[in-house]
Amino acid sequence: MGTSDLRNAPPGTWLPARRLARWIFQPLERFLHVQAASGIVLLIATAVALAWANSPWAASYERLWHTPVRLGVGSYLVERDLHFWINDGLMTIFFFVVGLEIRREIHQGELSVLKRAVLPVAAALGGMLFPALIYLALNPSPPERSGWGVPMATDIAFAVGALALLGNRVPAALRVLLLALAIIDDIGAILVIAVFYSSSISVTGFGLVAVGIAGVLALQRFGVRSPVVYAAAGVVIWAGLLSAGVHPTITGVLLGLLTPVHPWFGEEGFLAEARRALEDFQERATGGHDARELTGPLAQLSQARREALPPVVRLEAALHPWVAYGIMPLFALANAGVSLGDVHLGAAGSTRLLLGVVFGLTMGKPLGIMVACSLSVKLGLAALPRGVLWRGVLVVGCVAGIGFTMAIFVAGLAFGAGQRLGVAKLAVLLGSLISALVAMAVGRLVLRPAEAGQIAATADEAEASTEY
């Protein structure tokens, strides 16, 4: 056994087996480091769900996601189906990662300047208003009129995955703009659901949310660093939002925005703490101490390593792979299976409903986002992020037309069950697919890979840019 093999393999390793494992898993590891890999996995999961839901085995698809799952402690039990725990439980972690990224950008990124933070707010408002107006123009009368909220929503998971397929053509600031826009859009959609599509709102639930948020702030004041304790406070917030009739995944956004952005030790503190830990380790190791006594300096070194980074950065790095390759594909598999067998476009009002949703997503979203961004910049209220040109905003507008699961959810509230719901689902599917394809085509035409590194020299240059 060579020296390099001794260094690269734990004691007791059978080297032929280790080489075989490396030969098998290295291509997978290289794939996972490709920027668009998460988007590819997401699209594969979507295709599987669609094929499964429209196959002879469609009943097994429905049966799987309606499997009851019971969680609880002692006599307090909550039983919901698997679909609920994925959409309202696991997706909270996705929203937490999104909240972390937004928090980091607000602190030291492109959103740290108020003038630039205004842009995603304006984009989200325009991206909600124009689709609703287009839909209402085509469907002015009830009962189809009640579906005006369907094309307003942007599906963050699918939109981010689709944008990832463009790889290094997408500047980091453009992705942040989409994330911020989609978060605000999603909050807007939830407010629409709460105000126009909800039967009742529980004030008690919001009281529980306030208690949870106060708990998080108190824990930070006491210097508590354990993620488990904060997760417990997050469960309280989640339960409060669920009880209040608000989508509980907003818990993730709230916790992400509350996450500290300053490290405990920092760079200099880490070096000093690590130096002390290594000196202690060397003293104990050379002094013939029992191996168990080495755990102290190693724990000290581990704490220094952990606290050298801000919690917002550390948590984002730890959770991102799980979200990108686990939660998001599972979410797609559970939600993308739209059965099209019962859709009849010949029924009264069906064609207008279909066109209202499709045009709202494919035309209303990019048009509303472009108009709102242009007005806010021209009026001096906002500025384009550094490195983002108007052509990039156009791509974001197209990607934002991927409504999918949130749009389907709103459709269920607007139309209940029956023919109109089937048409609305088909329209959401078509509109989202067209938006994704148009975004890919436009992105490959107008965004060049080199642009990822071409940053506007100044904020004024980015703001004044009219180049597409």
UniProtKB/Swiss-Prot annotation:
Subcellular location: Cell inner membrane
Membrane topology type: Multi-pass membrane protein
Signal sequence region: none
A molecular function (GO) term: sodium:proton antiporter activity
InterPro entries the record matches: Na/H_antiporter_dom_sf, NhaA
UniProt keyword annotations, A-Z: Antiport, Cell inner membrane, Cell membrane, Ion transport, Membrane, Sodium, Sodium transport, Transmembrane, Transmembrane helix, Transport
Transmembrane annotation, as ranges: 31-51, 82-102, 118-138, 147-167, 176-196, 199-219, 226-246, 321-341, 353-373, 393-413, 422-442
GO aspect biological process, one term: regulation of pH
Keyword Cytoplasm: no
Cross-referenced NCBIfam families: NhaA
Membership in a protein family: Belongs to the NhaA Na(+)/H(+) (TC 2.A.33) antiporter family.
Protein function: Na(+)/H(+) antiporter that extrudes sodium in exchange for external protons.
Protein name in UniProt: Na(+)/H(+) antiporter NhaA 2
Taxonomy of the source species: Bacteria, Pseudomonadati, Myxococcota, Polyangia, Polyangiales
